Amino acid sequence: MAAESALQVVEKLQARLAANPDPKKLLKYLKKLSTLPITVDILAETGVGKTVNSLRKHEHVGSFARDLVAQWKKLVPVERNAEPDEQDFEKSNSRKRPRDALQKEEEMEGDYQETWKATGSRSYSPDHRQKKHRKLSELERPHKVSHGHERRDERKRCHRMSPTYSSDPESSDYGHVQSPPSCTSPHQMYVDHYRSLEEDQEPIVSHQKPGKGHSNAFQDRLGASQERHLGEPHGKGVVSQNKEHKSSHKDKRPVDAKSDEKASVVSREKSHKALSKEENRRPPSGDNAREKPPSSGVKKEKDREGSSLKKKCLPPSEAASDNHLKKPKHRDPEKAKLDKSKQGLDSFDTGKGAGDLLPKVKEKGSNNLKTPEGKVKTNLDRKSLGSLPKVEETDMEDEFEQPTMSFESYLSYDQPRKKKKKIVKTSATALGDKGLKKNDSKSTGKNLDSVQKLPKVNKTKSEKPAGADLAKLRKVPDVLPVLPDLPLPAIQANYRPLPSLELISSFQPKRKAFSSPQEEEEAGFTGRRMNSKMQVYSGSKCAYLPKMMTLHQQCIRVLKNNIDSIFEVGGVPYSVLEPVLERCTPDQLYRIEEYNHVLIEETDQLWKVHCHRDFKEERPEEYESWREMYLRLQDAREQRLRVLTKNIQFAHANKPKGRQAKMAFVNSVAKPPRDVRRRQEKFGTGGAAVPEKIKIKPAPYPMGSSHASASSISFNPSPEEPAYDGPSTSSAHLAPVVSSTVSYDPRKPTVKKIAPMMAKTIKAFKNRFSRR
């Protein structure tokens, strides 16, 4: 009756909360709700939680509504929220498992969940609601909360441990077949945990005994299957499973329940370690023979070849990963045994279960063979090369072609120089590689024979080019010409001989002769690079004299470079100075002749050259030399130029002056522009330049009287425009301009003017970076 009356009161208060917006009334109703004995069933039937939760953002009542909702949330048991999480976790694990194992585990899980729901639902049935509601809520809440928390911790640990297996690079390819070992048997871990909990809580909750019996039976089956599984000689997989068992037991079992199982765990560890040590000592072929049951002779041979290839050629890390991949095989027989033990068929052999799993084993073996196939080949090649004798090492190293050109030459599409020796050796290696590939397709016994035969082939083929090279070296010194024994003079201490022209010409690359017009067209096409690099002019490359010059040649060379320094030459004949005088201009030649009158009779031919160059149409008069003709025509030309300059100057002087230059604001203050005036007013820089006024009188021009009078008229202030003495009408802070030069503020640093091209470049850069 009390529950029904509380339900009615809650419904009334809920209706009032929805209808009345007054904050005082709302607070009153919420306080009444907080005093009522509200249960989970009332919250589910009325939905008052949603109504109160809608007021959580209210200005006046929001905080009280939030507190009330938080108080009601504590009433809801954690078990209901934990079960869907557990189901999600089971789904995520079941994706990684094989389908047959998944069905078996779902059956077990369904049986277990039914018993759990049956026991758990009694406390919420309507018969027990009125009688045992208070007692059961007090007893069950701590048990369920702790149980839910511990199950969450289990899942977290599972998820923490699973990435270590999934991150393994070798086992990631087999993700569909293999599941993380730490989460392989969640029922086993859950049942162990649940049994230990129930042993502690037996006097408190009495109706959980059916679940306990079920879990004990299930645990016994699991223990039997594990003991059978221990007898099989799977060393590394069992040891790894045992380590996982150990870590899961350490994390999940409470301290009180550990004492019985510690001894069994330690004994199992010791037995597994002994087994693994014995198997490591045994040869690999025996291990493989035990693991794989006999199906047929051909399959045996193939499997042995694959295993021997793996163990010989793969590095130890890959071998370990292959052993690690065998864990699904151990897990599948275990699940098969669990299923059979349920049905009561104890006479079922383990060998038959392993025989059913043969197709899976074959698939995994083929996958293993596919993935390291490239590594096997490369390792075989390395072994064949390493097994060659040390005497042949230098020849074998030459087989791999070193880069013959620089990186720059590869970029410019230069053709590499071919070497006959290397071509022969590469053919030998190609034959060897073909032999290796053929032998790889056959059995491993033939593989090893081919590896042993390879050195002999390489020996015979490398000896032949070596003998040919020796014969070539013997022939080369016979071709060289024998130099005659000539007595050489003693070498001077300060003498440095220069290279001859013949030697320089031999170093220069000769241009390729084109055999056909098509090649000429291709060479002319700029998009294609020829054998030689593109030549770009970068100054004269010959920085030294091509050959040794005589003393006369050196003197003439110095005189040619310093003609303006030649004055009197004394008794030097014209024949010696002729090459120097040929380089002279008419003015230089005339000056040298003035100092040396003896040369005038000899230089007529030089003057003839100057006359033909400067005065092409003119001819010498009767009995007139070429020198006299040039001087006459040159004087006439200069006279004409002087007359022209006088005429032009006179014409410009008599022209009326349309525009006259006047000095503005000589004795007054110049008005600055508006923007300058505003800045002066703003910063107070107007009257700081010159405090007192100075009247400046313009200096008269030093030209004629007419110009002086005109200038004096122009510069004197007219009576219409009196001199401005007072300050400007616009501003009292304006400074008088002293001279025509612009006055600048000494506080500001002088800015260096940027060149126009540089300014343009800087502007382009700014525009470019401002867009980003």
UniProtKB/Swiss-Prot annotation:
| Positions of region (Activation domain) | 522-681
The record's listing under CDD domains reads: TFIIS_I (cd00183)
Q: Which gene encodes it?
A: ELOA
Q: Which InterPro entries match?
A: Elongin-A_domain, F-box_dom, RNA_pol_II_trans_fac_SIII_A, TFIIS/CRSP70_N_sub, TFIIS/LEDGF_dom_sf, TFIIS_N
Q: Where in the cell is it found?
A: Nucleus
Modified-residue entries (Phosphoserine), positions: 196, 384, 387, 516
Q: What is this protein called?
A: Elongin-A
- Lineage of the species this protein comes from: Eukaryota, Metazoa, Chordata, Craniata, Vertebrata
Q: Which residues carry this modification: Phosphothreonine?
A: 394
Q: Which organism is it from?
A: Homo sapiens
Annotated Gene Ontology cellular component terms: elongin complex; extracellular space; nucleoplasm; site of DNA damage
The F-box domain is annotated at: 566-610
Cite the domain annotation text. Answer: The BC-box, which mediates binding to the elongin BC complex, has the consensus sequence [APST]-L-x(3)-C-x(3)-[AILV].
Among PANTHER family, the record links this protein to: ELONGIN-A, TRANSCRIPTION ELONGATION FACTOR B POLYPEPTIDE 3
Q: Which residues carry this modification: N6-acetyllysine?
A: 434
